[in-house]
């Protein structure tokens, strides 16, 4: 492929809410510029969503990149570097790094659904990166499409001019040539100096079985050449570049990448953890002094324990997590043991969707059957002796007497909902200890901003929001700060033994409701044993809820006919003694479904 002047390069990303059609638009752009032939595209949708789970759920998880060659109407040849980014809030870090590598964005909005909460979040990120934004209205061929109304919405909510928005239908290809022209005429070319020292941004990295770690880069200044020796400024490690190339989406090797270009390098790097996203890559012999403004590393927000149902699968689980970790640096895990569930891992995730996807990938790709404990967040604790702790497992919480203050993380949530469901949405947020910040109307929809404790959101807030709004509300959040909270550690005791996998930190006002709901659920699902089993929810030494599973008993008086009552009483007393002894030494088997159901209860 011949080199093109930097003024003819366009680097852009597509930002949109889940399901507004950005991966389908990417398919059309690839097809119309000849990145893949019609035969290669046949029977394949969402070419860039390479994981099965991405296609099946219709979501993009990993940011993908593709280079396209395009001859514009002005007769010049252009190079487009397209970054397909995820739309879901958990993967916002994937979005941030893709946006930093581009100069412009296509904002795709579904003409029948309008602007959604995550569209807003991603657009604001693009504006923070000084992007030029071209609004694109997708699905205009649907009977429910209201392009004029949505244009007005884009102007009202986001504040960018949408009068010349491109009207398309990504599925049929209608209007897609206009998008290609808009990229040429309305998005700016990158800036960069070919003669300066090499400076490149590390956008992403993943593990390839044959090539080792593949690093996705955006060259800012200088030239990235095959055979040169480069240094990662964040870690200080130096490597020899073995391959240089780009994706069309097929891997294509070249000798060098110039300023403004996006491509990949391989350099015998052993682990993805050695390549920090947002790092600056420079020439090892004459390095630059200033690093590029990088990204914040992705910090896990939600934690939960994952345990294999079959204890023999422990090593398989360890290996599987190691493999997933190769490609997902934001996923962390450490070993933990539980008296009830045996050996497992305490894992950190970016959010609930991330947790769900990792769990699903473990069960699907590695055929593992897992139990997940209740998700929890990181709490900060100040002890009476002045030390400060961070705790992400309720089991590790110190004695109440030693704690001076507990702080929990809070988020700012933006919820967009149709007007008729506003009441139910506000009630849900109030029930979750939320504080309303603002309420504005965008056409027939309300946009609410709420401060909420993350602890209340990680359980089932998203599912509840979808059910109270019949699936119409959309939700996005970002962490704000830590605030002091009146939290207590609630334990569930079965036959006077605490079940560590079910202990959790809850707000004092909600402890009783949740405790009662959990013990009632457990009572239904623990089968009767030969002795009675008390199930209790307790805070410290105080029991706040109790249910009892009745004992199975044999009718010991069946063979006594008439006669003296003392004989019957003696047999009943003897049975009672036996049951008492049994209860002392008996072990209660808690079925797996009892755990799962207890963790899902709504108080």
From Swiss-Prot:
GO CC annotations on file: plasma membrane
Pfam families: EFG_C (PF00679), GTP_EFTU (PF00009), GTP_EFTU_D2 (PF03144), LepA_C (PF06421)
Keyword Cytoplasm included in the entry's annotation: no
Key words of the record: Cell inner membrane, Cell membrane, GTP-binding, Hydrolase, Membrane, Nucleotide-binding, Protein biosynthesis
CDD domains: EF4_II, EF4_III, LepA, lepA_C
Domain of life: Bacteria
InterPro entries the record matches: EF-4, EFG_III/V, EFG_V-like, EFTu-like_2, G_TR_CS, LepA_C_sf, LepA_CTD, LepA_IV
Protein localization: Cell inner membrane
Catalysed conversion reaction: GTP + H2O = GDP + phosphate + H(+)
Enzyme Commission identifier(s): 3.6.5.n1
Membrane-topology annotation of the record: Peripheral membrane protein
Residues that hold GTP according to the record: 19-24, 138-141
Single GO BP term: positive regulation of translation
Domain tr-type G: 7-191
Gene Ontology molecular function terms on file: GTP binding; GTPase activity; guanosine tetraphosphate binding; ribosome binding; translation elongation factor activity
Predominant location: membrane
Cross-referenced HAMAP family: LepA (MF_00071)
PANTHER family cross-referenced by the UniProt entry: TRANSLATION FACTOR GUF1 HOMOLOG, CHLOROPLASTIC, TRANSLATION FACTOR GUF1-RELATED
Sequence similarity: Belongs to the TRAFAC class translation factor GTPase superfamily. Classic translation factor GTPase family. LepA subfamily.
Summary of the function given for this chain in its UniProt record: Required for accurate and efficient protein synthesis under certain stress conditions. May act as a fidelity factor of the translation reaction, by catalyzing a one-codon backward translocation of tRNAs on improperly translocated ribosomes. Back-translocation proceeds from a post-translocation (POST) complex to a pre-translocation (PRE) complex, thus giving elongation factor G a second chance to translocate the tRNAs correctly. Binds to ribosomes in a GTP-dependent manner.
Protein name listed in UniProt: Elongation factor 4
Native organism: Bradyrhizobium diazoefficiens (strain JCM 10833 / BCRC 13528 / IAM 13628 / NBRC 14792 / USDA 110)
Gene designation per UniProt: lepA
